[in-house]
Every structure is written in structure tokens, then in C-alpha cells.
């Protein structure tokens, strides 16, 4: 380490610390383990097992291009988080520079252009929301000749795209000079448009509910609902920008914080199990409903508890659905060691679900 220049930083100093501190410890430990292992049969067995296992672990790595690139990226990101560089505001100044557009040469033209855009788009959204209010909210039905799949799948994508484009357009309009964005008429029209976008999001959620009522709930449909909540939260953040004249940097940071918080929280939820429990609960209340057992079985461990509830439901003729046989197969697979997977494939959720299944047997 003393041979390195005093000005050296980053990877050179990390390598020097490893060579001067870690490497001698590793080498001396291995040397004395081998010497003592040669004079002690039990210790020697342990040392041989350790080195054999270590060599097997070292040579079993998957050095494919994709994995090398991914873990290199993770390593570099981890180093940056452990010891961040002193960049100051260098990486964020560009956002401040584009936070506001320059003042227009003809303010009246820019003002009326913005007003007419908001008025026209409010009128279009009002028409779409009025149709939804009539068919969805008042009658809770779909037009004649339109299937639930068409009503949900073909309509939802376009409506979500419309709301996202609305958010982008509002950001552009209210990054104009404050002499324009601060006008009460523009603010009022923008807030009305945000309200219409939120109503449109609730209509999409109601479309999803009608589809689930007709068929079943699945984890992707729960994910769609979570996505709608994120978009709605983004519009609320946008409302604060408009009312408080927040910068583009603030809007970006607030939205990134919202997305990170939701994604971090959702990873702890078992969406498959939630969908399975919901479907089985509705089937228990109304056995005439169609219950997609193939979907429950495809969920793996997330569907075992719900399948156990189906198996415990008394049915004429024994087990007409074959659920008990399926769960018995899961138990046999466990006894046969099928679930004793590599430690890298171990999942706490599956282990807990397996414990629940076996304890209920």
C-alpha cells in the first residue's frame, strides 16, 4: 500500500488494501490449516471437505455474458453507494436549466394557445367520462355487442396512454415562464383536467372490477390496479407542482420516490395468493361460479392454501376436482426431496407455504 501514490483513489486503493490486509490473512490461515490438518485426522477431514467444497463452488459459477455484465453493474453500483463521489450538483444542474422555458416573445399568443389546449382537451375528456358515467357508473354494464375482454383489454391500454400523455403535456405547459403558468385560468383548467384524469382512472378500475366479476382475479390484474394507483399518485404530485410552482427536479424526485416506495412495499405481498384467496372465497359463497383450478395450480406454493380450502369443501362423489390428489402429489414431492433445492433457489415464501400445507395434513 505504501508503494501506491498518495493521490491514488478508487479501485487502486481497494486493490492495495486487499493485497496488504486481506491476502496475508487468507494465505496464513490456509497454510496453518493445512499443517495442523496433517497432524489431526478430524481437523484434516474438515479442512479437506472445506477446500473440496470451496473448489466445487468456485468452478460451478455460470460465467455467461449476461451474468457477468449484470454482476459487474451491481458491483460498480455497490461501490458507488458505499463511497459516493463528491459530484455536488453537477449531475442535476441540467434539470434546473430546463426547469423553465424562456419567456415567450408574444405572451398573449402563448397564453391563448395554452388556454385553448386545456379547454379542448377538457371537452374531449368530459365526453369520454360522460359515456363512462352512463354505461359504467349508472348501469354497471357494457354496450351491446361488446364483450368484457374487448371492453377491458382494448379500452384500458388506450385510456392509460391518454392519462400518461396528459401528465406529460401538463408538465410541458407548466414549465413555461411563471408569467404564464401562474395565471389563475390556466391553473383552474389544469386542475379540472387532472380531476377528469383521476375520474378516468377510477373508470378503468371499474372496468377491471366488471371483468373480475365475470371471470376471476389474477395477479396481473392486481398489478394493473397497483399501477393505476401509482398513476393517480403522480397526478396528485402534479397538482402540487401546479399550485406551488414546483420545479421539474422536484416533480421527478417525488415521482421516483413514489414508484420506489410502492415497488419496495409490493415485493413483500404474495399477489398470487391474494388472487387465489379472493377467487376461492367467492366460490365458497356461490359454488355455481366458475373456479379456475388450473390457474390456482399454476401459482405453485401461492395457491396451495386456497387449494386446501377447496379440498376441504364437502362435495358429492368425493373429490370431483382432483384437488386432494394434486395436494397429495405435492406432499409426495416433498417427501421425495424435490423441494430440497439449491440454496440460491430457496424461497422463504415457498418454505412457509409448504409448512402450512404439511401441518394441515
Model-predicted regions and their roles:
Residues 294-361:
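Extracytosolic and intramembrane catalytic regions of membrane-associated proteins
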Residues 16-91:
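Extended, domain-scale alpha-helical bundle/helix-rich regions
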Residues 14-17, 52-69, 144-161, 217-229, ...:
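Short aromatic-rich membrane-water interface segments that cap or initiate transmembrane helices
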Residues 26-42, 121-140, 203-210:
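Alpha-helical transmembrane segments and their membrane-interface junctions
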Residues 118, 122, 248-271:
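Internal/C-terminal transmembrane anchor helices
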Residues 2-17, 46, 80-118, 131-151, ...:
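Juxtamembrane membrane-water interface segments of multi-pass membrane proteins
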Residues 262-289:
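Hydrophobic alpha-helical transmembrane segments in integral membrane proteins
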Residues 26-31, 65-82, 228-239, 256-269:
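Alpha-helical membrane-embedded segments
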Amino acid at each position: 500500500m505504501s508503494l501506491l501514490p498518495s493521490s491514488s483513489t478508487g479501485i487502486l486503493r481497494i486493490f492495495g488494501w486487499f493485497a496488504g490486509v486481506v491476502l496475508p490473512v487468507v494465505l496464513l490461515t490456509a497454510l496453518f490449516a493445512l499443517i495442523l490438518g496433517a497432524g489431526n485426522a478430524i481437523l484434516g477431514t474438515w479442512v479437506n471437505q472445506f477446500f473440496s467444497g470451496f473448489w466445487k463452488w468456485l468452478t460451478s459459477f455460470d460465467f455467461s455474458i449476461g451474468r457477468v455484465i449484470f454482476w459487474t453493474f451491481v458491483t460498480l453500483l455497490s461501490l458507488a453507494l458505499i463511497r459516493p463521489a463528491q459530484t455536488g450538483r453537477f449531475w442535476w444542474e441540467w434539470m434546473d436549466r430546463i426547469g423553465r422555458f424562456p419567456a415567450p416573445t408574444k405572451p398573449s399568443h402563448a397564453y391563448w394557445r395554452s388556454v385553448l389546449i386545456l379547454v379542448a382537451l377538457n371537452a374531449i375528456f368530459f365526453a369520454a367520462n360522460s359515456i363512462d358515467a352512463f354505461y359504467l357508473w349508472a348501469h354497471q354494464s357494457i354496450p351491446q355487442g361488446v364483450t368484457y375482454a374487448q371492453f377491458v383489454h382494448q379500452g384500458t391500454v388506450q385510456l392509460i396512454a391518454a392519462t400518461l400523455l396528459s401528465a406529460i403535456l401538463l408538465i410541458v405547459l407548466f414549465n413555461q415562464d411563471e408569467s404564464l403558468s401562474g395565471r389563475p385560468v390556466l391553473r383552474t383548467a389544469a386542475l379540472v383536467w387532472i380531476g377528469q384524469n383521476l375520474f378516468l382512472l377510477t373508470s378503468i378500475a371499474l372496468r377491471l372490477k366488471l371483468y373480475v366479476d365475470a371471470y376471476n382475479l389474477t395477479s396481473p390484474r392486481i398489478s394493473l390496479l397497483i399501477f393505476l394507483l401509482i398513476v393517480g399518485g403522480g397526478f396528485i404530485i402534479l397538482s402540487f407542482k401546479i399550485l406551488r410552482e414546483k420545479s421539474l427536479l422536484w416533480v421527478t424526485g417525488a415521482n421516483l420516490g413514489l414508484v420506489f416506495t410502492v415497488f419496495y412495499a409490493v415485493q413483500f405481498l404474495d399477489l398470487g395468493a391474494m388472487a387465489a384467496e379472493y377467487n376461492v372465497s367467492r366460490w365458497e359463497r356461490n359454488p355455481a361460479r366458475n373456479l379456475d383450478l388450473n390457474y390456482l395450480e399454476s401459482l405453485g406454493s401461492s395457491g396451495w392454501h386456497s387449494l386446501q380450502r377447496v379440498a376441504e369443501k364437502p362435495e358429492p362423489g368425493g373429490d370431483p376436482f382432483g384437488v386432494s390428489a394434486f395436494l397429495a402429489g405435492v406432499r409426495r414431492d416433498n417427501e421425495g426431496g424435490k423441494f430440497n433445492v439449491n440454496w440460491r433457489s430457496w424461497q422463504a415464501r415457498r418454505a412457509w407455504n409448504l409448512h402450512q400445507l404439511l401441518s394441515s395434513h
